[in-house]
Amino acid sequence: MLVHPQIDPIAIQLGPLAVRWYGLMYLLGFACFILLGRYRIKRNPEGAFTISMLDDMLFYGVLGVIVGGRLGHIFFYQFGYYLEHPLEIFAVWQGGMSFHGGFLGVIAAMALLARKYHLRWLVVTDFIAPLVPLGLGAGRIGNFINAELWGRPTDVPWGMIFPYVDNIPRHPSQLYEFALEGLAFFTLMWIYSARPRPVGAVSGMFLIGYGVFRSFAEFFREPDEGFMGMMTLGISMGQWLSLPMILAGVIMLVWAYRTQAPVSARGKAGKAGKAANAVVAGKRGSKER
């Protein structure tokens, strides 16, 4: 049996300014996004993306993550609490972010970015999908440090007691999610995106991969208390929100392989691909790739 180390959530205290581990984990995730993105761009200098565009992606993405993630947490999990404590809506540094809300926020943000640069939306989402999982994993480490989102009671040897909760051994579900949504998911997306595939396939695989990993991890995670934490049929809110992702991912993969031209890992279509994409490119302008 293990005991949670009860790490101080404040990493650095500079007078009245407190830098929390949770915020540092988000910064680590954004740093991984930039480093991996730069690596992919340098490997494909003739591709659709540049370093300056990557900086814009990060800016748009951060806004999408923070706004969407916070609103998702409020409406999906703790609506009643924030209705009674509206000022705490803005205390994002204390934790309380929803992946599914952040995902919707990023989707909207990338649509705006694609429009700005005259790119196909799926080309943008295919590019960023492999850059995201390590950030998700970093966020789960932040959850573990904060001693939040703990697991369900268990009798496994590695069960962990969270003193802030009770004295019952529980699954360290934050670490499970770090391994699944962070490391395993990153490996899957990085390898898959490096192979020839049609436009939209990487985005579809992202939806399926995250949905499956998250749904599996939810069996070990204590359902969130409050508004819509546990839904019908014994399925948690996280699982209900992941099911549409999996379905949409399957549909997107089938659509991509049936209608889109094969594209190499460097973003170059073959002869058949160029012909198949000519109509799409003509509709969106000569700059769209």
Curated annotation (Swiss-Prot):
Regions that span the bilayer: 17-37, 57-77, 89-109, 121-141, 174-194, 200-220, 235-255
Membrane topology designation: Multi-pass membrane protein
Pathway: Protein modification; lipoprotein biosynthesis (diacylglyceryl transfer)
One Pfam family matching this protein: LGT
InterPro entries per UniProt: Lgt (IPR001640)
GO molecular function: phosphatidylglycerol-prolipoprotein diacylglyceryl transferase activity
PROSITE patterns reported in the protein's UniProt record: LGT
Residues the entry annotates as binding a 1,2-diacyl-sn-glycero-3-phospho-(1'-sn-glycerol): 140
EC number: 2.5.1.145
GO cellular component: plasma membrane
Keywords in alphabetical order: Cell inner membrane, Cell membrane, Membrane, Transferase, Transmembrane, Transmembrane helix
GO biological process: lipoprotein biosynthetic process
Subcellular location: Cell inner membrane
NCBIfam families: lgt
Role, per record: Catalyzes the transfer of the diacylglyceryl group from phosphatidylglycerol to the sulfhydryl group of the N-terminal cysteine of a prolipoprotein, the first step in the formation of mature lipoproteins.
Family from the record: Belongs to the Lgt family.
PANTHER family hit by this protein: PHOSPHATIDYLGLYCEROL--PROLIPOPROTEIN DIACYLGLYCERYL TRANSFERASE, PROLIPOPROTEIN DIACYLGLYCERYL TRANSFERASE
HAMAP family the record matches: Lgt (MF_01147)
Record's protein name: Phosphatidylglycerol--prolipoprotein diacylglyceryl transferase
Organism: Nitrosospira multiformis (strain ATCC 25196 / NCIMB 11849 / C 71)
Name of the encoding gene: lgt
